[in-house]
A protein has these predicted regions:
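Non-catalytic interfacial helical region
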Residues: 2-145
Length: 145
């Protein structure tokens, strides 16, 4: 139950993380949302975040800036990914990575452990932006002229 939102436009990357968080909240309405910044979080903070608390059996853990994570945090997330794939009571984890080469080893390690990757489109050209907007309208069964 680990997802990595990878690369692309920063606004769309944030939007996808918000969408996944809302989907997880709809599936587990009693869950807490715990946000960690991988820049200063360590493996102990991650272990505490995914563990049950007095108020909720599970938490929805959002790990921002995965590209800044240290090796130990990456190893713990990968190990959790391997364990949580068969656990119905596992806490969903949503990792946000800006893309690029920084933190690529940790990204690859977590993907290899079984995480689901969601690549965000990079909208640098005007045609790509227009096509993306049109797809968003179509997805919501709306029309724009």
């Amino acid at each position: 139950m680990v997802s990595i939102v990878y690369g692309g436009d920063s606004y769309l990357n944030d939007q996808r993380v918000r969408d996944l968080t809302h989907q997880a909240l709809n599936a587990y309405p009693d869950a807490d949302v715990v946000e960690l910044d991988a820049t200063d979080a360590d493996r102990y903070a991650f272990d505490e975040a995914v563990s049950p608390s007095l108020l909720a059996d599970r938490a929805i853990v959002v790990v921002r800036n995965l590209q800044n994570a240290d090796e130990k945090l990456g190893d713990v997330i990968a190990a959790y990914c391997g364990q949580s794939n068969n656990d119905a009571n596992a806490s969903p984890v949503i990792c946000q990575h800006e893309g690029g080469t920084k933190g690529k080893r940790i990204h690859d390690l977590i993907i290899k452990a079984g995480a689901r990757e969601e690549k965000v489109p990079d909208l640098k050209k005007a045609d790509a932006k227009i096509n993306f907007v049109m797809q968003q309208f179509e997805r919501r069964h709306r029309r724009v002229n």
